[in-house]
From Swiss-Prot:
SUPFAM superfamilies: L35p-like (SSF143034). Keywords: Ribonucleoprotein, Ribosomal protein. The lineage of its organism: Bacteria, Pseudomonadati, Chlorobiota, Chlorobiia, Chlorobiales. NCBIfam families: rpmI_bact. Pfam families: Ribosomal_L35p. Belongs to the bacterial ribosomal protein bL35 family. This is Large ribosomal subunit protein bL35. The keyword Ribosomal protein applies. The keyword Secreted does not apply.
Length: 64
């Protein structure tokens, strides 16, 4: 059988922390920031963690 390949799009969007959790960036934080208030744009630049079944799916996609 051929090797399992990791999903390259998932590898670029998600990172695995040292404790094994999946970290992601928030959406809508890259452009049109002058329309969004300062509190919202600050919050959009913070990363967050995935939870539950989505985290299991992404971890499987990253490891290949």
């Amino acid at each position: 059988m051929p090797k399992m390949k990791s999903h390259r799009g998932a590898c670029k969007r998600f990172k695995v922390t040292a404790s094994g959790k999946i970290k992601r960036e928030r959406m809508n934080g890259s452009h049109n920031l002058e329309k969004k208030n300062r509190k919202r744009s600050r919050r959009l630049h913070q990363s967050t963690l995935l939870e539950g079944t989505k985290a299991k799916q992404i971890k499987q996609m990253i490891q290949g």
